[in-house]
């Protein structure tokens, strides 16, 4: 991935950080079995009163033979689900496919896709967060090692 010096610095140093009321989660900080579709983050001390979750950045590599219109991010502990035929199953972060071959878009204010959500019921006592990227329809996405995303979680401290 071609990065500017500033972009490279941000990519390497965003990592998992805890501020008084914000947790920055980078999918490259995986714990548990290595998988590019799934990852878990252990949070210590546990977070109480999570109120908002926001997708700050997504850079998703293209699996071979992919013709998916978008990918979905799921995190059950935060109520971030995947839309189903029966209707919505909670908040869904959508990573759309850009019109350029081999490129996934960043989120921006002009983007109609959801990238920030207030949690309906504040999540309490979070000590582990499990994230998963799925294809349209719910199958495993088959992400590559160059795929990652950064999520910001706000909570009452």
Q: Model features per residue range: what roles?
A:
Residues 1-157:
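The ATP-binding site of the protein kinase catalytic domain
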């Amino acid at each position: 991935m071609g990065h500017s010096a500033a972009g490279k610095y941000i990519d390497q140093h965003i990592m998992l950080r805890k501020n008084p009321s914000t947790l920055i989660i980078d999918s490259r900080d995986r714990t548990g079995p290595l998988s590019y579709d799934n990852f878990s983050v252990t949070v210590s001390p546990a977070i109480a009163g999570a109120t908002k979750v926001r997708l700050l950045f997504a850079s998703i590599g293209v699996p071979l033979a992919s013709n998916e219109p978008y990918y979905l991010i799921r995190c059950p502990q935060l109520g971030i689900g995947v839309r189903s035929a029966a209707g919505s199953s909670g908040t869904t972060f959508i990573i759309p496919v850009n019109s350029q071959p081999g490129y996934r878009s960043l989120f921006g204010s002009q983007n109609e896709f959801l990238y920030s959500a207030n949690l309906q019921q504040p999540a309490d006592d979070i000590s582990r967060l499990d994230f998963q990227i799925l294809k349209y329809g719910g199958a495993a996405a088959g992400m590559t090692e160059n795929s990652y995303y950064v999520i910001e979680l706000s909570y009452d401290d």
